[in-house]
Amino acid sequence: MATFGAGCFWGVEETFRQVPGVIDTAVGYMGGTTENPTYEEVCTDKTGHAEVVQVEYDPEQVSYEELLNVFWDNHNPTTLNRQGPDVGTNIARLFFTTLKSKEIPQKNPKRKWIKAGVGKIRL
């Protein structure tokens, strides 16, 4: 299981659904202080939640590192709380790792963005 936030969760979910080896996806919210927030509450930027997609995948077909590459390749990490026309703290870019995968972000494509000189990476 992996969880990513990279903008409006509907588009992010569709992107991950196209990846071979992804079994299922679910959208929701993570972080924040409001228990069981509604979409309307999250969009006020007062709950602290981010829109996320939980990705269930078969590690025999796709690795966490490959999913992380999909994450980096499908959003602009240089704009804070904005992805395309969507703006707000709920549009944060983030990913959550498991104990087994926590070392992977250290060698991820974030470095590719930095080397390309695109500006500050905002997670």
Curated annotation (Swiss-Prot):
Signal peptide from the UniProt entry:
none
Instruction: Give the catalytic activity.
Output: L-methionyl-[protein] + [thioredoxin]-disulfide + H2O = L-methionyl-(S)-S-oxide-[protein] + [thioredoxin]-dithiol; [thioredoxin]-disulfide + L-methionine + H2O = L-methionine (S)-S-oxide + [thioredoxin]-dithiol
**UniProt record, GO biological process:** cellular response to oxidative stress; protein modification process
InterPro entries from the UniProt entry: Met_Sox_Rdtase_MsrA_dom, Met_Sox_Rdtase_MsrA_sf, MsrA_MetSO_reductase
- Tell me which domain of life the UniProt entry assigns to the organism this sequence originates from: Bacteria
- Alphabetic keyword roster: Oxidoreductase
EC numbers listed for it are 1.8.4.11
- Kindly identify the residues recorded as the active site: 8
One GO cellular component term, please give it.
Answer: cytoplasm
Q: Name one Pfam family in it.
A: PMSR
Q: Which terms does the record give in the GO molecular function aspect?
A: L-methionine-(S)-S-oxide reductase activity; peptide-methionine (S)-S-oxide reductase activity
Instruction: Sum up the protein's function in the record's words.
Output: Has an important function as a repair enzyme for proteins that have been inactivated by oxidation. Catalyzes the reversible oxidation-reduction of methionine sulfoxide in proteins to methionine.
Recorded family membership:
Belongs to the MsrA Met sulfoxide reductase family.
| Protein name, entry field | Peptide methionine sulfoxide reductase MsrA
What are the leading ranks of the lineage? Bacteria, Bacillati, Bacillota, Bacilli, Bacillales
Gene name per UniProt: msrA
